[in-house]
From Swiss-Prot:
FMN binds at residues 10, 16-18. It comes from Burkholderia lata (strain ATCC 17760 / DSM 23089 / LMG 22485 / NCIMB 9086 / R18194 / 383). This is FMN-dependent NADH:quinone oxidoreductase 3. Homodimer. Its cofactor is FMN.
């Protein structure tokens, strides 16, 4: 069965721009893959433990030498990495906060970049284990970061995502940028009017 992993990381709940667009993507994906399955992971609805010294020690302990306590400490992280390996495709909603990802998304990434789970060491260097999968990123940003925008050079998020997921082996990446979203939250723009061209951009991916 073809499987899509939908990841949301905005703390804005139903008001989230990125979440509405990942949902639109999932609906269109199911139309294109009627026998497929969408697995939803909302990073803002779970309590992720911090990456502390004990977690790092557990992570770098060989699996056959970990204690029961260490395995329990890594259990949620292993659930995340299993979801990534089990999926054939990803759609990932990422709000831009202070020119980077949301805190929830960054913590999730720290949980999933793991030796033997999503990356392995080879004689020629690290090799990502998520190859052969497509990732579509939906970025929502308050300011405008398009090619001709004044702040275009401050879009650090897209190259960062390309670097990180490329390290994990993902080569097929697509981006939908819903920038200028501050106009919605300040009442300068109607939500439906703002979303319309971005919904069209998502649908165009399936044309």
């Amino acid at each position: 069965m073809f499987k899509l992993l939908q990841i949301d990381s905005s703390p804005m709940g139903d008001a989230s721009i990125s979440r509405r667009l990942t949902q639109e993507y999932a609906r269109n994906w199911l139309r294109a893959h009627p026998d497929g399955r969408v697995v939803e992971r909302d990073l803002c609805r779970i309590a992720m433990p911090p990456i502390d010294a004990a977690w790092i020690a557990a992570n770098f302990t060989p699996p056959d030498r970990r204690t029961a306590q260490q395995n329990e400490m890594l259990a949620l992280s292993t659930t995340f990495t299993t979801e990534l390996r089990d999926a054939d495709e990803y759609v990932i909603g990422v709000p831009m906060h202070n020119w980077g990802p949301s805190a929830h998304f960054k913590l999730w990434l720290d949980h999933i970049v793991r030796q033997g789970e999503t990356v392995e060491t080879t004689p020629s260097g690290p090799r990502g284990l998520l190859g052969g999968r497509r990732a579509t990123f939906v970025i929502a940003a308050g300011w405008r970061y398009g090619p001709d925008a004044e702040r275009a050079q401050r879009n650090f998020l897209e190259p960062w995502l390309r670097t990180l997921f490329g390290f994990l082996g993902v080569e097929d990446m697509r981006f939908v940028m819903a920038d200028g979203a501050a106009d919605v939250f300040t009442g300068k723009a109607d939500s439906a009017v703002f979303l319309a061209p971005h919904v069209d951009a998502v649908r165009a991916l399936f044309a």
